[in-house]
Amino acid sequence: MSTYTRPVMLLLSGLLLLTLAIAVLNTLVPLWLAQEHMSTWQVGVVSSSYFTGNLVGTLLTGYVIKRIGFNRSYYLASFIFAAGCAGLGLMIGFWSWLTWRFVAGVGCAMIWVVVESALMCSGTSRNRGRLLAAYMMVYYVGTFLGQLLVSKVSTELMSVLPWVTGLTLAGILPLLFTRVLNQQAENHDSTSITSMLKLRQARLGVNGCIISGIVLGSLYGLMPLFLNHKGVSNASIGFWMAVLVSAGILGQWPIGRLADKFGRLLVLRVQVFVVILGSIAMLSQAAMAPALFILGAAGFTLYPVAMAWACEKVEHHQLVAMNQALLLSYTVGSLLGPSFTAMLMQNFSDNLLFIMIASVSFIYLLMLLRNAGHTPKPVAHV
């Protein structure tokens, strides 16, 4: 049986279109807020509102899938995100955008959970790794293309919203031509997310997802603002964000192979150390292109390696619940990161963005170094 079946290919095709829309908005919303003369802390709170929506969407989607299945859940998630896009044009203001970014965050998280769970249920223990790799590649390619779009098209609010909303609705079309079955859902209902979060042997993986959320949430939410305050144009900001994301794309396969060959603990240690080096390089303002590249290559691949670490510690029937727990952990980190970092930037300096990233990475590195590497034999492979 082929790994990349027709339902899988159509699902990933729809995800690509949705990711394009998500990437464009994630880059431009902080800039639109800055153009409305909102303070840095307000920009951070709006970013956190989006990630709060992610948190709510992650918690709700399991129930939604159980009630209406993968296909209808996917349609619903896409419509919710489209509403969050279109709503930004109704009224420009802090409270209005706080609400609509929350709605968009709910829809976005629902899309992620539906797609990830559908891929898990479509695969087997032998091919889930390839499915997850394909998912991450599509996600980052979509994000990369979205950043390039920002550098090539008009970034005016009312110019962007119509085609971004259209892209979101177009992402529904591939799933109209196939049906993703939920054959294994009943087998996963008995495993709770809470029990996965409390699993001692998977704690480094869970902590890694939290740290990854803090790092990537801060980069996505506040990096455009950091560059804007440095006098970089909107088009150039799109280019630099594309450099950051392209590094994450290029790093996926080699880092995954290194993790399989040399062990995930060693690779996680090296990744976190490189994130610290990249942050220091950004603070020194020396050679921004190499600094952003190594920061992207290490930071954007931290989540899948940490996720693989945690998933290999659980039984086969616990994989979906563990995946939900890890996404929840990532979302919590994404919620806390931009909000706290934005307050530091507002009160002290924009450089606190990279000081914060380096600090939380150093804390995680200490956790990894405390582990002697004598971990239990893996019981499941994703």
Swiss-Prot record:
The keyword Cell division does not apply. Keywords: Cell inner membrane, Cell membrane, Membrane, Transmembrane, Transmembrane helix, Transport. Pfam families: MFS_1. The keyword Flavoprotein does not apply. InterPro entries: MFS, MFS_dom, MFS_trans_sf, MFS_YcaD, MFS_YcaD-like. It is found in: Cell inner membrane. HAMAP family: MFS_YcaD. This is Uncharacterized MFS-type transporter YcaD.
